[in-house]
Amino acid sequence: MKRFAFYLLPILLCFAVGLSASYFQSDSISEWYPLLNKPALTPPNGAFPIAWSIIYICMGLSLGRLIERGANKTLSVLWGIQLVVNFLWSLLFFAFRNLFLGLIDILLLDILVWIYISRVYRKEKAAALLFVPYFLWLLLATYLNGYVYLYN
């Protein structure tokens, strides 16, 4: 049971943060975001909850694996910091509708996730590889945020 908790609790935390972020996004997603100029590479709206669900599971599994393997607390703290920065992006971009601060935040998030992957890879390759889909999605999101900032 304890081993199961190593994985379940981080996954639930990711979904809780994601649901909290969606609370602050809802009005902007339905009223403001559709009016913005977006690039042709913008995924359909239905892709976002699917992608984030997969990403949250992978993020939680990554931390769970680190905890189970007894990795140092620095990596867990880094995981937590990137989750907070991820949440802040939703506030900055959607709730405050500040495209510039959203872009700064997501660039910071890109860096934090890259650092996490590179540091975790040295200790636990599987845990690092679980973050790769998240990093790739973030790169797309960074492109989208940058485009929206430049053309709106």
Regions found by a protein language model. Give the residues of each.
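Membrane-interface helix termini and inter-helical loops of multi-pass transporters
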Residues: 27-40, 150-152
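Non-cytosolic membrane-interface motifs at loop->transmembrane helix junctions
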Residues: 35-38, 99-108, 130
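Core segments of transmembrane alpha-helices
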Residues: 52-63, 82-85, 109
